[in-house]
Regions:
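Conserved catalytic submotifs in the C-terminal HATPase_c
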Residues: 97-99, 120-130, 167
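Short conserved segment of the HATPase_c
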Residues: 184-198
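Helix-loop junction within the histidine kinase core
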Residues: 85-96
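A conserved beta-strand-to-alpha-helix junction within the catalytic ATP-binding
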Residues: 95-110
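Short alpha-helical segment of the dimerization/phosphotransfer core of two-component systems
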Residues: 69-74
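Primarily the dimerization/phosphotransfer
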Residues: 14-48
């Protein structure tokens, strides 16, 4: 007959095994994500070094642009991995400030517009919006992730709608980012916020990503005591982020999350 202590040891061993497997899975996924752009960069760099004189100017420019794009992909992946590492170590310092949302949305839309020049961005705000209490850097990252996702998964010359509204009864501010992109199947809705989760379809395979953006977004929203949800049909998705309206006593508070 097993003692109570032996059950505790077995349970701890199982937890340790699960943690070890999670770490192995994480390393395997990161290695794959790093290997893909690095292989591309090395391949095109080798071609330029060994066959430069035989390539046309157009081919050289094309290969250099591929190297640049894959380098940017690597930088984005490393930045996301550093963010994930901070969040999981519970050493992420949050410095809260009371802010007006519209200027942050306007600035982020302008940044995204420079990347997706054919898209149209429609922005609407309620009048007399209350302020919200957030870490400004983290809030900007949330905005950029959501607007970039809406743009990335939509065809050229698509429209992205961004709205900020007040829910008077619940004293909250609701940020909505809506697109007319490829949509998300109902069976995938609960998966999209998971780490390294990407919907596998012929359309999504053509779009670069590492499956960390929405995981980071959801984690940051929840660390700042907000909520995030998504609705999607056959075409288009709408992400909503909800924050409580600011209170004066919260301004300037710091927290390590």
């Amino acid at each position: 007959m097993k003692s109570k202590n032996s059950y505790i040891i077995v349970t701890m061993d199982e937890k340790q095994n699960n943690l070890d497997q999670a770490h192995l899975d994480f390393i395997s996924t990161v290695s794959h994500e790093l290997r893909t752009p690095l292989t591309s960069i090395r391949g095109f760099a080798d071609t330029l070094l060994t066959s430069y004189d035989r390539l046309t100017p157009e081919q050289r420019e094309k290969f250099l642009n591929i190297i640049k794009d894959q380098s940017n992909r690597l930088i984005n992946l490393v930045e996301n991995l550093l963010t994930v590492s901070k969040m999981q170590s519970d050493k992420e310092l949050m410095i809260y400030k009371s802010i007006d949302v519209p200027p942050f949305v306007d600035a982020c839309v302008q940044m995204i517009k420079n990347q997706y020049k054919t898209h149209k961005y429609v922005v609407n705000y309620d009048k007399n919006l209350p302020k919200i209490m957030v870490d400004t850097d983290k809030f900007q990252q949330i905005l950029l992730n959501l607007i970039d996702n809406a743009s990335k998964y939509s065809k050229e010359a698509s429209t992205v709608w961004i709205s900020v509204n007040q829910n008077y009864s619940e004293n909250t501010v609701i940020l909505s980012v809506k697109d007319e992109g490829i949509g998300i199947a109902q069976e995938d809705i609960n998966k999209i916020f998971n780490k390294f989760s990407r919907i596998d379809s012929p359309l999504t395979r053509k779009i670069q990503g590492n499956g960390l953006g929405l995981y980071i977004t959801k984690t940051l929203v929840e660390k700042m005591n907000g909520e995030i949800c998504v609705e999607s049909k056959e075409k288009g998705s709408e992400f909503k982020v909800i924050f409580k309206s600011a209170t004066p006593e919260d301004d300037g508070k710091k927290a390590i999350c």
